[in-house]
Amino acid sequence: MKLKSFLLASVVAMTLAGCQTTSEKQTAKSVANVPLGVPLAPNYRNEIEIARYSELLLSPEINNDQKAELFLRRGRLYDSVGLSTLARIDFNRAVQLKPDLASVYNFLGIHHTLTQDFGKAYEMFDAVLELDEDHQYAYLNRGIALYYGGRPELSSQDLEAFLARSPADAYRVMWVYLAQAKVDANAAYEQLKANSQALNPDEWSTQLVQLYLGQLTETQFLAQITEGVAGQQQYAERLCEAYFYLVLIDNIYFNIIILK
């Protein structure tokens, strides 16, 4: 399962919970205009992979390091089919068998973020970077945890470090903006405009930045949502992204109005 997809599904849930304090009228305005997708069919391949890893874990011929890797892989698959409790059990088993497996701490940190146990989440992401300082997604994940944990200044630092590793990634640009907007909305807008210069205008994700910059209206943004879509899976992911960022932009603008 793609890490970006897992992260997006995770933070969408957190954002929706947080947006309940925002004007219902504003939120409904955006959501009502989002196109609907066809429900995705279950991914039976993942279920088959889970069964295969379960059989391998019963083998007496594998050592603890190999078991840890298998628990990590099966845990990720459990996450992909929505079995988060089983995923956490496997991740914890992997840590017990191989305490220096950085990726496991990364996923545990995500789970702690989802349960809003931010202190534990920070510890997990710190552990990732102690074991592997080049693990770039730990900067993203810790930045997201800090963002939802109410520490936007520290969040900005992590997300800027994540952006520096790929300045042409619109999603990274967006997360830097979201964190900076919590500190200084006007400065964040100017930085978003500057960071957008490195983006490819032909990438759909760039339209997210254009939406936030006011270069696209919401109607124009939604009208182009199907362009270049290769299949139902990609369409579902794009709808999820559109919903997520539309809710956030309404929340940001609402907060700016309140502050004024």
Regions found by a protein language model. Give the residues of each.
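N-terminal leader/linker segments that initiate helical-solenoid repeat arrays
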Residues: 19-73
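Hydrophobic/aromatic packing residues within the alpha-helices of TPR/SEL1-like helical repeat arrays
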Residues: 53-54, 91, 125, 159
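Structural marker of alpha-solenoid helical repeat scaffolds
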Residues: 59, 63, 97, 131, ...
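Helix-start (N-cap) detector for alpha-helical repeat units in TPR-like alpha-solenoids
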Residues: 64-68, 102-103, 136-137, 169-171, ...
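Canonical tetratricopeptide repeat
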Residues: 73, 106-107, 141, 175
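Register position in tetratricopeptide repeats
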Residues: 80, 114-115, 148-149, 182-184, ...
